[in-house]
Amino acid sequence: RKQEDAEEAARILSEDDSKVFGIASDVKNFEDEKTAVSEIIKKFGRLDYVIANAGLGIFKPVDELSLEEWNDMIDTNLNGVFHTMKASIDELKKSEGYFISIASLAGTNFFEKGSGYNASKFGVVGFTQAAMIDLRKYNIKVSTIMPGSVSTYFNGNEPSDEDSWKIQPEDLGELVVDIFKMNPRALPSKIEIRPSKPTS
């Protein structure tokens, strides 16, 4: 959501600003997502790939979960994916592009203190899979990736050596690139990925 963070991420990806640039956008705000797509079209002329990756997790028993916390998770995790897809869908029709949502194994596996997070991720999986069926006729490919534990800054975590057993961000990056490289006749519509070994 912060422009400086988006610009720093862009610098890490490439120093050539003709190939990459950062845009701050709040996925809870549909107008933000529309503006982001407009900026992409203005700079590159087309939109081929969209990855919906924003996420928020608040883990409490349901009787302690506030209405604001519930709405924050639903607005970010579920409505955010809808906003991102809705804002980009016309351009993806033109390019016959690819939309990927990063869901979670929590989208099919419920757990204690996960009522709000589970609800949002179950919703993302259902929404993205239904959208995949809707959009195939336009030659738009839609996939859902459902990771297990990933070593990121999610939910206040500070990645460290203790996270070495987890999926690393670059593992997910490689998976996404592999999906894009597949023959267009094949559509991996739902992919589960988890650490190969349990927590040590």
Question: What is the meaning of each model-derived region?
Answer:
Residues P61-V62, E69-N71:
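Substrate-binding pocket helix/loop in short-chain dehydrogenase/reductase
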Residues Q3, A24-T35, L67:
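The beta1-alpha1 cofactor-binding region of Rossmann-like NAD(H)/NADP(H)-dependent oxidoreductases
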Residues T144-I145, T152, D161-S200:
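C-terminal helical subdomain
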Residues D63, N109-S115:
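Active-site loop immediately N-terminal to the catalytic Tyr-X3-Lys motif
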Residues M85, S120:
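Active-site helix of classical SDR
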Residues N109, A130-I140:
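Active-site-adjacent segment of SDR/Rossmann-fold oxidoreductases
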